[in-house]
């Protein structure tokens, strides 16, 4: 169960998506969603690394100021 949705609800949603977009468009949509998730994860990871770099630089600056 995902977010309060059971298997019957997920099947109904999948059928509606198939009707709206058609079977031919589904691989393109899936690929686009996958790329979006990958880019989001990369941006999050980069932001965390940059945050860590800022903390390290601030600590070094504090040591130099003493």
UniProtKB/Swiss-Prot annotation:
InterPro entries: TatA/B/E, TatA/E. Belongs to the TatA/E family. It is a single-pass membrane protein. Part of the twin-arginine translocation (Tat) system that transports large folded proteins containing a characteristic twin-arginine motif in their signal peptide across membranes. TatA could form the protein-conducting channel of the Tat system. One of its GO terms (cellular component) is TAT protein transport complex. GO terms for molecular function: protein transmembrane transporter activity. One of its GO terms (biological process) is protein transport by the Tat complex. The chain crosses the membrane at residues 1-21. Keywords: Cell inner membrane, Cell membrane, Membrane, Protein transport, Translocation, Transmembrane, Transmembrane helix, Transport. This is Sec-independent protein translocase protein TatA. The keyword Iron does not apply. Its main location: membrane. The keyword Transport applies. The Tat system comprises two distinct complexes: a TatABC complex, containing multiple copies of TatA, TatB and TatC subunits, and a separate TatA complex, containing only TatA subunits. Substrates initially bind to the TatABC complex, which probably triggers association of the separate TatA complex to form the active translocon. It is found in: Cell inner membrane. The lineage of its organism: Bacteria, Pseudomonadati, Thermodesulfobacteriota, Desulfobacteria, Desulfobacterales. Residues 45-66 are annotated as: Disordered. Coiled coil: none annotated.
């Amino acid at each position: 169960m995902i977010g309060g949705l059971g298997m019957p609800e997920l099947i109904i949603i999948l059928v509606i998506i198939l009707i709206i977009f058609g079977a031919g468009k589904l691989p393109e949509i899936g690929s686009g969603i996958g790329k979006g998730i990958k880019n989001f994860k990369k941006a999050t990871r980069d932001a965390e690394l940059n945050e860590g770099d800022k903390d390290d630089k601030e600590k070094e600056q504090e040591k130099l100021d003493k």
